[in-house]
Amino acid sequence: MTPVGMDRKSLSLLILIVLLGLCIRLQNFGEIFDSRIYYYGYDPYYHMRLVEAIVLEGYRPSFDYYINYPYGLRIDWLPLFDYILAFPGLFLGFWASEIFAVVFPVIIGVLCIVLVYLISLEVLRNEKFALISAFIFSVCPVTVWKSLLGKADHHIWVVFLLLLSIWLVTKPGLLKLLSGIPMLLMALSWLGAPIYAALLAVSSLFQFNEKEVRIVGISNLIPVLSSIQNLFLGFSFLAIAVFLLVGSFVKRFERRFRYAIVYYLCICSVALLSAYLMPVGWLGFVKSGISYVLGTDIYLPTIREARSFQILGVISSAGYLFFVLAIPALFMLRNGFLKVFFVLSFLISILQLRFVEVLAFPVAILASYTICQILERVDYPVFRKEEEGESKRRGRKEKKKAVEIRKKDHATVIAFLLFLALPCFANSLAPVEMTMDWKEALNWMKENLEAQDYLKAYEKPDYAVLSWWDYGNWILYVAKKAVVCNNFQAGADDAAKFFTAQSEEEAMKIVEKRKVRYVVTVEELTVKPETNKTKFIPIMQIAGYSPEYMKNKEIIDFFNKTMLYKLHVENATNLTHFRLLKNFGTVKIFEVK
């Protein structure tokens, strides 16, 4: 046995699962470490902009004139994640933070696999069950995407803290109190922390006894300390703590009133809805939280990960066949926490696709349980000890002859699991969004456009670059130039109006308002008859049009009259105030004359 109580065989298998998860997450190594370090996605580039300021300037900006130019924007991202990435750079230089930011999500992703294994052990105390759970989680597409090499975003960090809290909650006695510490760290890293804390709180009511629920409630007083950073967060966690403490009192009546907790949840839901509808200023944190979950913001429907009612997207992101296999376990496994957590995380994933990251955890464990039951029924012992040399089937077949487990049986089980995981492997492949054309364009802009004092976030620069908001953080971090809009969506309305403008005069009003000197366009913004893949539809929506009520031909006709068409397709040949400055294939840079 190993020091942690695992036999060597189980430890070896866990290491193999971790190595498999590690290999999948290193898939983009060559694209990340190119001529310089690049990151995966869009938001990581603004995190690194903040990290660079921390390391080189000694402060983290709370306001930035280099986005939403020329007005600037307050930075509402919470600081802990950026300080974690900045930590090695404070001692070794910014290069250390650049490398650390690349590998950090992979490290955290691997630790999440181990945590799922540990949580599964707390659920059933069965090594095989826990190993299969860890395997499923390691290949789950959404967990891979969130922890890819170079994905320097807070998502996998938040998932790790949630899993750590859940593991501590499943521990006996006062260890449950410690679950509030990861929640505090989450509250210092992400404004949506109360959403995941609420999932854990409601699920706890259906699993633990009165005393245990009370301890979990007290643990939620620890993240109330986050009110030092943000009052909204402090009030939210205080409300969750009160919810659990009152819930522990309600648990007393469960023997007399079977559905006491259900009634209690209904009352709390009505109270929450009333707070949302009441025109009371100090309840604004409730309204903003519910609005965030419901995705009522005008920009959210145009963001891929914030789309609603993407049921197939939720199922595929959570593991395809593993999601389907998780459903029977809802009726077989006697664990209220997992069942409720699965249902709640599925519901919020339907509201916004981004929340599927927390659905992966219950899917992995529930699917593992179903698979284990299937293996039991084909005489492969999972919940029975192999050393007993006897098949202990339920019902009338308890005295059946012993089943000899051979190596080929283990190989068959492994092949079966890999077969179930094939769709996950295929869906987990995620090439870096920044193409070679973009890399060349951004580096050319950095070297050839008028220099700006990029690290002086509080000082307004002379001009801005206008592109679609998807690419704002790239232009800001790599090219070191101010932008009209970035992934915060501030300024996106003016960018959309510019690209959809039907005349040069109309477009110039935006240019003058935003002090734009350069415009960057890219092929994927345009509309082509042979494909429906375009970002022009959300551009139209944000500009105030309704493409959902237009036929494809009408959209094409509309596009052919826009500034985006006149710039990217016609290369500004028929425009007076714009000229093509540089062409990088799919990416083009225009100068305002």
Curated annotation (Swiss-Prot):
Residues 1-12, 120-128, 176-180, 251-265, 332, 376-411 are cytoplasmic. PANTHER family: DOLICHYL-DIPHOSPHOOLIGOSACCHARIDE--PROTEIN GLYCOSYLTRANSFERASE SUBUNIT, DOLICHYL-DIPHOSPHOOLIGOSACCHARIDE--PROTEIN GLYCOSYLTRANSFERASE SUBUNIT STT3B. It is a multi-pass membrane protein. The chain crosses the membrane at residues 13-33, 99-119, 129-149, 155-175, 181-201, 230-250, 266-286, 311-331, 333-353, 355-375, 412-432. InterPro entries: AglB-like_core, Oligo_trans_STT3, STT3_N. The lineage of its organism: Archaea, Methanobacteriati, Methanobacteriota, Archaeoglobi, Archaeoglobales. It is an enzyme of class 2 (transferase). A motif (DXD motif 1) lies at residues 41-43. Belongs to the STT3 family. It catalyses: an archaeal dolichyl phosphooligosaccharide + [protein]-L-asparagine = an archaeal dolichyl phosphate + a glycoprotein with the oligosaccharide chain attached by N-beta-D-glycosyl linkage to a protein L-asparagine. This is Dolichyl-phosphooligosaccharide-protein glycotransferase 2. The record marks D43, E305, K535 as: Interacts with target acceptor peptide in protein substrate. Pathway: Protein modification; protein glycosylation. It is found in: Cell membrane. Its main location: membrane. A glycophospholipid binds at H154, R354. The gene is aglB2. It comes from the Archaea. Its cofactor is Mn(2+); Mg(2+); Zn(2+). Oligosaccharyl transferase (OST) that catalyzes the initial transfer of a defined glycan (a GalNAc-linked heptasaccharide composed of 4 Hex, 3 dHex and a sulfate for A.fulgidus AglB-S) from the lipid carrier dolichol-monophosphate to an asparagine residue within an Asn-X-Ser/Thr consensus motif in nascent polypeptide chains, the first step in protein N-glycosylation. It holds the Pfam family AglB_core-like. GO terms for biological process: protein glycosylation. The keyword Transit peptide does not apply. A motif (DKi motif) lies at residues 524-539.
